[in-house]
Amino acid sequence: MNNKSIRTQILIEALPYIQQFRGAIFVIKYGGAAMKDLISKERLIADIVFLSCIGLKLVCVHGGGPEINFWLNKMNVESKFHDGIRITDELTMQVVEMVLAGKINKELVSLLNNKGVKGVGLCGKDGTILTARKAQCGSIDMGLVGEIKSVDPYLILTLLKENYIPVIASVGADETGKTYNINADFVAGEIAASLGAEKLILVTNTSGILADVSQPESLIRDTNIMQLRQLLSRGIISKGMIPKVNCSIRSLAQGVRAVHIIDGTKPHSLLLEVLTNNGIGTRFLYKQSILLQLNCFSFSNVSI
């Protein structure tokens, strides 16, 4: 098959997905670990622009842990963690907000705008998108680590209606205005649920869920809530993947139709996952017969 035939076949394969998802809402969570490589970042932005141009309604939620660590180090502020959660005092919170809402957020918006689409930079405070509260993390006081009390999607829906791409930093506030550092996976998951999103896509620096972490070819392509519970109980899902899986389960239980975990360092992984038959990562599918109670999953097992 020559190159022209291959290109034609790719377009034909993508066509039913373009037709199916036109007008659908996708929430894309862009992880800090996947942001380190500028080339990968530019490819992902190109994928987002492509999906927007074919009629998808996109919301981007981002974290930025490595960048936060970098700036705390430059300021000679020690990064402190407990069980993988960043202990967030007042000074650390100021740096977190500065880096997420002031630096990373505006960089992503600029990249989108430079490609001809309309990105709008926000954080959870804007339009009271997120109402936060202090997270309960056992007996340890984690400072200004927050969890989501409620989501108001009105501003996001208004922007989507006008064909903007909201880019949301994972910072929120409570009813008194106190600012909290919130895990970006859970921010993306709760926003996806509030929007009735077709898909939640977690862009990371890992291929997805592996049946054997030492075997890259053991990628689990499709799974569901019951199977995820089994993988968690067997310890196959561990460390930083646990909060991603927990937020995925919560999202599915609240009506998001599918959740995907993909490796954002692979060229055009977002397009490959969404517009091809075989995909490139792990896909979690909703099954009503095994719907779980939301209180089975705690916000305390979160890495920020």
From Swiss-Prot:
Its EC number is 2.7.2.8. Keywords: Amino-acid biosynthesis, Arginine biosynthesis, ATP-binding, Chloroplast, Kinase, Nucleotide-binding, Plastid, Transferase. The record marks K29, K244 as: Transition state stabilizer. Substrate binds at G64, G65, R86, N181. It is found in: Plastid, Chloroplast. It catalyses: N-acetyl-L-glutamate + ATP = N-acetyl-L-glutamyl 5-phosphate + ADP. GO terms for molecular function: acetylglutamate kinase activity; ATP binding. Its main location: plastid. Gene3D superfamilies: Acetylglutamate kinase-like (3.40.1160.10). GO terms for biological process: arginine biosynthetic process via ornithine; L-arginine biosynthetic process. Pathway: Amino-acid biosynthesis; L-arginine biosynthesis; N(2)-acetyl-L-ornithine from L-glutamate: step 2/4. It comes from the Eukaryota. GO terms for cellular component: chloroplast. Coiled coil: none annotated. It is an enzyme of class 2 (transferase). The keyword NAD does not apply. Belongs to the acetylglutamate kinase family. ArgB subfamily. NCBIfam families: argB (TIGR00761). Catalyzes the ATP-dependent phosphorylation of N-acetyl-L-glutamate. This is Acetylglutamate kinase. The gene is argB.
